[in-house]
Design a protein with these regions (language model features):
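Sec/Tat signal peptide C-region and signal peptidase I cleavage site
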Residues: 14-20
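Flexible loop/hinge segments at secondary-structure junctions
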Residues: 20-185
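Sec-dependent signal peptide recognition
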Residues: 1-7
Length: 185
């Protein structure tokens, strides 16, 4: 009987078993989602965990992490103590990547080079025509984030640093006086 048990144990040890892979879920910032997708693809290819990351915005990712509906959250800015205090399972904050924020525009034939003050005035709706920037006379529509976003926080911090005329404040969400809002970067 002892020999049978040893043989049976050997059979289990030597028999190939379907590889059990860890699955992780995360949510948060859309800004780094492209690099995260690449990293998670490479990780899975190397037999690492499979990661499902939803680029829902920093604010939603933070909430999902606090609510324990995901394994990890990602944000463009670190959690504040009031949010850290809500986390019941432990927390490690790690800087993952850096990036830049740029003004994108769609106006063929317009070679735009904004000053910092012009950037502030476009974002605040003070400049609302391309003619004011040296381009053809047509309405300028400002597009901005509508969801809670670490990118918006970084952007509004820059606008405030650029000019004393910036009156919208700073943060993951501000009350934009003009424009069209959309989710994600």
């Amino acid at each position: 009987m002892k020999a049978f048990a040893v043989a049976l144990l050997g059979l289990f040890v030597l028999t190939p078993v379907a590889e059990a892979r860890t699955r992780l879920s995360g949510a948060g910032a859309s800004f780094p989602s492209k690099i995260y997708s690449r990293w998670f693809y490479d990780l899975a290819k190397e037999k690492g965990p499979r990661v499902n990351y939803q680029a829902v915005g920093s604010g939603s990712g933070r909430k999902a992490f606090i609510d324990e509906t995901v394994n990890f959250g990602a944000s463009d800015d670190p959690m504040k103590q009031k949010d850290i205090d809500k986390v019941t399972r432990g927390l490690v904050q790690i800087p993952m990547t850096g990036g830049t924020i740029a003004f994108g525009y769609n106006n063929p034939g317009c070679d735009l080079k904004l000053t910092q003050q012009q950037a502030v005035e476009v974002a605040m709706g003070i400049i609302d025509n391309w003619k004011e920037l040296g381009c053809d006379d047509q309405k300028l529509t400002w597009a901005h984030r509508s969801d809670g976003s670490g990118t918006t926080k970084a952007f509004t911090n820059s606008m405030q640093a650029f000019s004393e005329t910036w009156t919208l404040g700073t943060g993951k969400s501000v009350a934009w006086p003009v424009g069209v809002g959309g989710k994600g970067n």
